[in-house]
């Protein structure tokens, strides 16, 4: 999301990069771009070629991967050219297109994290009822909503830029922050509101999970086999929710068979007669859930928060930053598109198997 404001000539007067510096920067950014492209392609191919992954929750992850792939293919390469050349030489029209695609895709990527968190929240707090509502059509509607909101957030500058052909100047491709209201509107809609929602949702998810773990740990004996099946379903449901891609469909009874067959962590059962043992397993699961949620939230916040703090500070004319700082913070945000496919699939066994299958197919071709 390349939204930079260089308000004074002094802010533009920076030391030119040496050839060595340009080469190092270029190689680093090319590696990031390549990895982002390959990892997101792998997620898309894994979901597309693995029938077991054809679930509504994974459609959201696939859409996130498509969005991050667009960032890698359409946004990052032009940013590399711009940074290495120290000036924009690709014309006014391409500048307009690039800025619009940049803002739309980055905003859409962030909003995808929001709907994934919302999907998980509903899945863990209202598992049975939401399993019936969790369909491909609902996932498609959520994806369409995300793209619509992203367009409404990122497109307004096109309307006033069309009347200002001399700004930005031909050598620069930046969005000028002379509309304070839009700066506040765009930063709130693209980051601060989604961040607040994500924090609230994952906080509630963690406490709901902790409560379920404690309830599981406190039950000494299961009354009958039917009750055991229901509790096992809840345990599997919970585990898969925190393993990032849960497998709920519209039919909870058939999904129980899949959960029961694929669960890796055994539920609390009659063998755990000692309260200390039950408490230890419950605490282990709580720590694992907290660790995964911490990684997801930490990666998102560390990637994008510095950029959007800079946007508000610069947009409100509190402080100006150099182009190097602006570029660094922009690429720190882009790196989130590299991290997303790792975080949202690495904790799931079915994704791991799908990736191994793709690698084996690649070796045989």
Curated annotation (Swiss-Prot):
One Pfam short name: 7tm_1
Species this chain originates from: Homo sapiens
Main location: membrane
Listed name of the protein: 5-hydroxytryptamine receptor 1E
Subcellular location as annotated: Cell membrane
Motif mapping: NPxxY motif: 340-344
Source superkingdom: Eukaryota
Keyword list, A-Z: Cell membrane, Disulfide bond, G-protein coupled receptor, Glycoprotein, Membrane, Receptor, Transducer, Transmembrane, Transmembrane helix
Tissue: Detected in brain.
Gene (UniProt): HTR1E
Family: Belongs to the G-protein coupled receptor 1 family.
Cross-referenced SUPFAM superfamilies: Family A G protein-coupled receptor-like (SSF81321)
Entry's Gene Ontology molecular function annotations: G protein-coupled receptor activity; G protein-coupled serotonin receptor activity; Gi/o-coupled serotonin receptor activity; neurotransmitter receptor activity; serotonin binding; serotonin receptor activity
Cytoplasmic side stretches: 46-59, 119-138, 204-291, 346-365
Disulfide bridges in this chain: 95-173
An individual GO BP term: adenylate cyclase-inhibiting G protein-coupled receptor signaling pathway
């Amino acid at each position: 999301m390349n939204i930079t404001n260089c308000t004074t000539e002094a802010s533009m007067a920076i030391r030119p990069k040496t050839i060595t510096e340009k080469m190092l920067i270029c190689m680093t950014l090319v590696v990031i771009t390549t990895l982002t492209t390959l990892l997101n392609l792998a997620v898309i191919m894994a979901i597309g070629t693995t029938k077991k992954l054809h679930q509504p929750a994974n459609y959201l992850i696939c859409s996130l991967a498509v969005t991050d792939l667009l960032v890698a293919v359409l946004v990052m390469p032009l940013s590399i050219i711009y940074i290495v050349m120290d000036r924009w030489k690709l014309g006014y029209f391409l500048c307009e297109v690039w800025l619009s695609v940049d803002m739309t895709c980055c905003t859409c990527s962030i909003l995808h994290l929001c709907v994934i968190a919302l999907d998980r929240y509903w899945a863990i707090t209202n598992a049975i009822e939401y399993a019936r509502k969790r369909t491909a059509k609902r996932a498609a509607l959520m994806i369409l909503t995300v793209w619509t909101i992203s367009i409404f957030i990122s497109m307004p500058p096109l309307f006033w830029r069309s009347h200002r052909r001399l700004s930005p100047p031909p050598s620069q491709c930046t969005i000028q922050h002379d509309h304070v209201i839009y700066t506040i509107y765009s930063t709130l809609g693209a980051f601060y509101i989604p961040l607040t929602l994500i924090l609230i949702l994952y906080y509630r998810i963690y406490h709901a999970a902790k409560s379920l773990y404690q309830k599981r740990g406190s039950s000494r004996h299961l009354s009958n086999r039917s009750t055991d099946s229901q509790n096992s379903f809840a345990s599997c449901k919970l585990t898969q929710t925190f393993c990032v891609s849960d497998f709920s469909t519209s039919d909870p009874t058939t999904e129980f068979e899949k959960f029961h067959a694929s669960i890796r962590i055994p539920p609390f059962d009659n063998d755990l007669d000692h309260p200390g043992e039950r408490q230890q397993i419950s605490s282990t699961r709580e720590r694992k859930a907290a660790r995964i949620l911490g990684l997801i939230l930490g990666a998102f916040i560390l990637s994008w928060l510095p950029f959007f703090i800079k946007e508000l500070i610069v947009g409100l004319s509190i402080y100006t930053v150099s182009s190097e700082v602006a570029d660094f913070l922009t690429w720190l945000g882009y790196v989130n598109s590299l991290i997303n496919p790792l975080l949202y699939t690495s904790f799931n066994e079915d994704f791991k198997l799908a990736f191994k299958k793709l690698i084996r197919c690649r070796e045989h071709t």
